[in-house]
Amino acid sequence: METKKTFKSFSCETNVVWKSARRGVVRAAAKPDIEVSSPPEFKGEAGIWTPEDMFVSAVNACTLMTFMAVAMQRGLEVVSYECRAEGLLEYLGGKYRFTEVRLYPQVVVKSQADVERVKNILESAHANCFISNSISSAVTLTPEVRVVAGI
């Protein structure tokens, strides 16, 4: 007898409060506030998170969380994971939009036998990250997988 899998819907709620000029605060229940500003290129303050930073970070963090969920499910032992991300913001058709988010994950494992598994799991994470699946920007992955010596 086949068991039918059911899927839930989820809701995410945030609140933004304007503070001054091009600066505000993002709030969510039971989480620390995040100060935000326009980027300096758009007359905002340097050194403060921007919506652009958060957009690219959302894709990056979702890919991490999806990768780790699949890795744990498949019994892959990950020594470390770090990923640099770049978002390409372009002026097209009279407006700015992110056309691409590039991810450069660096994953370290204990065994050479796990290198291909990591690449397969990264592809699965890439295909199933719900943030990436919700945006029109292309998301590319350029992974580097290393085996740690001496463990």
Listing of model-derived features with the role each one plays in the protein:
Residues 1-57, 68-151:
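Extended beta-strand/beta-hairpin segments
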Residues 62-63:
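Alpha-helical metal-binding/catalytic segments enriched in His/Glu/Asp
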